[in-house]
Amino acid sequence: VTTIYFNPIFQAYSNHRYDTGDYKRIDPLLGCEEDFRALCSEAARRGMRVVLDGVFNHTGYDSRYFNARGHYDSVGAFQSKESPYFSWFDFRNWPNEYGSWWGIYTLPQVNETDGSYQNYIIEDEDSVVRRWLRLGASGWRLDVADELPDSFIQKLNAAARREKSDALIIGEVWEDASNKISYSERRRYF
């Protein structure tokens, strides 16, 4: 065994955690940041890499970013158009009509081309991608990669490799990735 891949580990309100509540906090049921560092350190000592699942196409309805249920102390996009996260989401009729992953209302879809979102996930010094690599992860598996814009994937890959030159980036693509057409464009995964 040379690589350990984890399904989503970030705080969420479901058991599957594909409805991310906070990208910068490990779900308390799984441990804490200190546990994560120790696990990555021990894995590296044994010649293994740790790959995290990056769910960057959508967040949770009950998240610090959307906050439809008000469980977070931050002002989410569902609560106010003044939320720092409002531009991340595509509201058709705020607050109750918004784009969601495959029509599942508890998974509000994000606009991956939004500058604020890209900064938070990819570019900022403490961005999600860079932060977890710095804490010991070796790479990312991108959930529904065929639903992420090529430009987003390219920026994510570049930022990850700036942080860790041997960072591993894997994308979930259900069809033949060598000639995948998605949203009327040939994808450039390779």
Residue map of PLM features:
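Aromatic- and acidic-residue-enriched segments that line the glycan-binding/catalytic groove
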Residues: 15-27, 56-99, 182-190
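Aromatic-lined carbohydrate-binding/catalytic grooves of carbohydrate-active enzymes
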Residues: 1-38, 156-158, 164
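Hydrophobic faces of well-ordered beta-strands that scaffold small-molecule active sites
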Residues: 4-6, 50-52, 140, 169-171
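The substrate-binding groove and active-site-proximal loops of carbohydrate-active enzymes
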Residues: 19-33, 65, 104-122, 137-147
